[in-house]
Amino acid sequence: MFCQQSNNGYWKFENTKINLIRGEVFCMRLLIIAPEQIPVPPPMGGSVEHCIYEIARRFSSSHHVTIISKWRTGYAKTSKMGHVTIHRITASSSKNYLSKAIHKAKGMAFDRIQIDNRPKFVPAVKKAFPSIPISVFLHSTTFISAPMTTISQANKDFKGADLLIGNSISLEHHLKATFPHHSHKVRHVHLGVDVTQYRPSARRQAGSHPFTVVYAGRLIPKKGIPVLIRAMKKVRETVPSARLFIAGGTGKPSYKLHLKKLAGTLGVPVTFKGNVKHSKMPAFYASGDCFVCPSQGHEAFGLVNVEAMASGLPAVASRNGGIPEIITHRQNGLLVTDYRRPDAFAKEIVAVATEPGLARRLSTRAREDVLQKFSWKATAQKLQAIYISKLR
């Protein structure tokens, strides 16, 4: 039994309640099908898988959550943590993974199935479990647009789902505008951060030097790292000690080489840290004085901004996608409207470096806002409330 009856005859689910019907005991049994590429929890990177793991952990006190994800050497085939069970499977392809995931789930009882970031999985899952409601939790526009799919195909895939959940209001609006036939299904749930793990660093409070800018994210063109490197050249005209640390991996070594050559040509000191384990990310943020997110493509949410803010770092970010839902300009961070221009970023970075009062104010407010709005507990509670409202 995964929940308990309260004195007033309702079953409690944190801030939500379900009336008992005909005296039946009901506890939500949720199946989450993760993408096929990275295990849950991910050793490093894998923001989608990281989110699945963190949210499921917060669900577990009230419901039973089963996760199916990829297996990798070093992982158990099955893990149990409280009311969360993770089954990991080997697969040679995306199609093979889905087939094995469905086979693994057969024979188990679920009240809802959540598919993360893979709309194309919906038809096969719906065919296998026709009576179970399916939600699609989307973390970006990548798998609902070219070259991964077409609008027409995504429309067909969404037919089998009763909920489409985006990780920001921006993504919610995009889904409603792009798929109007499914607009009634769309909701949003902001992501969160472990506020006990990510916390302000004594190093920055001591005002150490040199001035260090940090970036965390994939090394791909739409993340805007060349814009940041060029901005750093401008920053160094005012702050000669300024340097850049970059954490993140790339699928194309040639792109990383391109970034290194650009930094060398411009005379910007850049240290590439590579893929950093999740357990080491708090220390990475602690090494910085300012965090920059120079995204050039649509950033659905921008979880790295929340991690940096929880760490007490002043954040400078593109006014793009869901980022303004996290950062309010000159209150808890700095937004760059003209984010194609390196000098626009340089201006805000220099402000953080040369105005200690501003930096302290942004840092304090950023931490306060994350504590209030962006904890994983808050994420899980909102998602849970959406699911339970559909079960009434």
Indicate where each model-derived feature is located.
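A short, well-ordered alpha-helix in the C-terminal region of glycosyltransferases
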Residues: A344, A351, L358-K373, K382
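Nucleotide-activated donor-binding/catalytic signature segment of Leloir-type glycosyltransferases, i.e.
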Residues: K256-V276
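Acidic donor-binding loop of glycosyltransferase active sites
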Residues: A286-A300, L313
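Carbohydrate-associated surface elements
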Residues: S170, G192
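Glycosyltransferase donor-sugar binding loop
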Residues: R243-L257
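Short alpha-helical donor nucleotide-sugar binding micro-motif in glycosyltransferases
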Residues: N275-V276, F284-G288
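Conserved donor-binding/catalytic core segment of Leloir-type glycosyltransferases
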Residues: L31, I165, A206-K223, I229-M232, ...
